Amino acid sequence: MKRNIVIMDFSGIYQEEQFYEGEQISWIDLSDISGTNCYCDGDAQAQILERMEKYPVSGIYFIDSGNYHYMSRIGIGRVKEPFNLLVFDNHTDMQLPAFGGLLSCGGWIASALEEVEKLHEVWLIGPDEEAYGQVEEPFKDRVHFLSRERLAEARPYMAEKKGSEEELIRSLEIPANIPLYISIDKDVLCPEEAATTWSQGDMTLEEMLKVLLALCSHFEKENGKILQVDICGECDSDKSMESPKNDHANKELLRFWKKWF
């Protein structure tokens, strides 16, 4: 069966990278659609969905820079069964835009919680405690945080004790009997590991991959289902000299996810 690896090209930055070379990929050119940078209007959403129509939900989707992280909201809108959402991000992405009718990269999770009936709960890995405090009350009952501070506290323990990632995943209590959609913004990584358009966290790529392995192993053991993974966090197209770091991170993430799709 052909693996579904999709490159969603808004900015042209993927043309500066090579992580997908030698892979059977699908390339969706979205660079001609106006009204997409950071915010996405209704007309743009309709055009994007039309171009995605022939591609299945299941698969590995690369969705450009964090300016286009709202693509995750568009992606989960195609899911037809009840599911949970796990997000790696340095930000909560729960700030609804001031203008109605627009989907934003900084508010797509809030939009999903309000509008996607099939979405049960959200797990966010990476934002700091202060960001959690700013989440609006109606959302807090359905959003679970693994904060930047808690990750920092766990880091020495994870480095010393084998199996600590499994303990961390168990502590999150993500149910394996409900399908899971995963979204990764590389801005959760430290600047040495990725170069993004937004402020960054301090997670290493190795730490992320260990946590993902523990999660996927848990789901495999429990016969759970991972619906899709999408990955964003490229740099601006006019800063392509930073692309090698992202290219390496994308290559390692693709290598990892190919084992699970």
Regions found by a protein language model. Name each.
Residues 100, 104, 200-203:
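Short alpha-helix boundary/capping segments
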Residues 66-69, 101-109:
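Short acidic (Asp/Glu) patches
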Residues 104-113, 122-127:
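Conserved beta-alpha
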Residues 2-63, 67-84, 117-139, 143-261:
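Catalytic cores of soluble, metal-dependent hydrolases
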Residues 85-97, 104, 108:
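Long, hydrophobic, well-ordered secondary-structure blocks that form the structural core
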Residues 96-102, 133-138:
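Active-site-proximal loop->helix
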